[in-house]
Amino acid sequence: RVGERACENGGAMTTVSVVGSTGSIGTQALEVAAAEPHRFDVVALAAHRSVDALAAQARAVHPEVVAIGDADLAAELKEQVPAGTQVLAGADGLAEVATRADVVVNAVDSFAGLPVTLAALQAGRRLALANKQSLIAAGPVVQPYRATPGAELVPVDSEHCAIHQCLAAGGPVARIVITASGGPFRGRSADELRHVTVEQALAHPTWSMGPQNTIDSSTLMNKGLEVIEAHELFGLDYDAVEVVVHPQSIVHSMVEFTDGATLAQLSMPDMRMAIGYAMAWPDRIATPFGRIDWNALSRLDFAPPDTEAFPCLALAYAAGRQGGGAPAWLVA
């Protein structure tokens, strides 16, 4: 049903497949689609093991097809979804779902997202990529498929989404600057970090993310992975990718051009803005997510990262520069 239904304005609706629909990014992608019901038609959903949540989404959205990564749960899922809904299972089922729509949101965790990335690009779909592991661990495998006719890769990570928007201005780039909130332990010394708890690490001050990304954010490992992701996405040398701590998380990233001009993308920290951008690109949609109240915004702070207290950032740079299997080892 790729582009089959018509919008009220006469254009074709954009069909959407959300793989990893029960996780943080997946559920927010469905919120974006619900906010623009005359533009987006969710035709496929997939999850790894969350049968009840996936079935509830299917009953609400009425997709044509659902897929469950754990094949042993397929029969249970089939009993709960609306009649007539096709049920797929296993890794092949997840990959198949990635070919069923105009836009594929890859919100799968870890390496399990790689087949989804490859299937979407091979099918010539627009890939709204939240699964950074696909590029970090398997960049040389993924990159050739970006040249598939019709294939588009639009990043969902707020930082890379910001860079994607700034680069649209054109012109030679001097460097990109990726912002980091600093996480829940910003300002703490290496000695103080020895006594923190998992619960504290999971209490991110700005973003609502899955547990793995939240833990990685507390150590700045996530920011290091984003440096490698930026290298793969935009083809810049690691010396041209910098990180700066920005606790308000309103400036999502910046691009400095060779003439000294710097462009930045600003919005309130709401992942739905970046998700909506990737789903609608190259268009813009009139959703309420991420809008700034400029009368309430009083300051924007920036500082260099503390690489002594947070050595994971330097480790990621080293792995990226080494290349080969080092990035895959880092993200394993």
Which functions belong to the PLM regions below?
Residues 8-332:
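Catalytic, metal-anchored helix/loop core of enzyme active sites in primary metabolism
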Residues 1-8:
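Extreme N-terminal basic, low-complexity initiation segments
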